[in-house]
Amino acid sequence: MDVRPLAQGLEFPEGPVALADGSVLLVQIAAGAIARISPDGTKTTVARPGGGPNGAAIGPHGKCYVCNNGGFEWHAEGVHRRPIGQARDYAVGGIERIDLETGNVECLDRVAGEVPLKGPNDLVFDVEGGFYFTDLGKVRARDMDRGAVHYAKADGCFITEVAFPMVTPNGIGLSPDEKPLYVAETEAARLWAFDIIEPGVVRKEPWPSPHGGRLVAGVGGYQRFDSLALDAEGRICVATLINGGITVISPDGRHVEHHPMPDPITTNICFGGPELKTAFITLSWTGRLVAVDWPVPGLRLNYAR
């Protein structure tokens, strides 16, 4: 695949969102900021929520909804950096709503019931206007949280836990018919599916499923899964760490193919362009946003601008 650089010098980019004008919205986790990358590569800061803005999605009324993980500590190697655990000044994670015109940041959710959100990571809106999101949790020197999937309404009036416990749940996406919900676990490098009964309610598989999900695929060797997007034919495109690239998995898990990228920390993918056949991919170790011509159109997201 021909990889075309769009922007460089980004501070651990993630959460790309393709906009109708050809620009790409993304987060810079290490800078605590949201930026817009124009087609010519110009970077404009949109908002500075602080903490660790992670996944992003456009929701109702054109607002940008962001999973904020609360922040990381960082290990630097020359110009490169990678997260190594919970920030020293970490307080809590949460869901934030950002006005892209003014940069105003509103906090929507900090708890789910009586459980604090630890490290919200990625989110996807359904056709009803609510959104599913992963809470990966936080990693410390000697222990780590067990993660969960939640469902919330865009106005902040409702949130419920959908699945627990999970091992570092990260990327999340809905199938074209919004029946299966897909969740990627980072450390286990597994892709799970949850069959949706109604918004915020999924059918639970019996034991030995640890959380009620149905295993779609796992990959061998030392690899880790990050965020994901679906194509129009229902295949799940998972950003893959260590073996840097995009792993494409069929809905039944029988077909798995890997598209290498020039970065071991390939963290996220979204689709844009006139026919949704341009994949925008964040290469976080090297601080770049790149574009790739994709053989299949991406799935159009609800509320896409």
Model segments located where?
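Sequence-structural signature of mature extracellular/luminal beta-sheet repeat domains
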Residues: 1-305
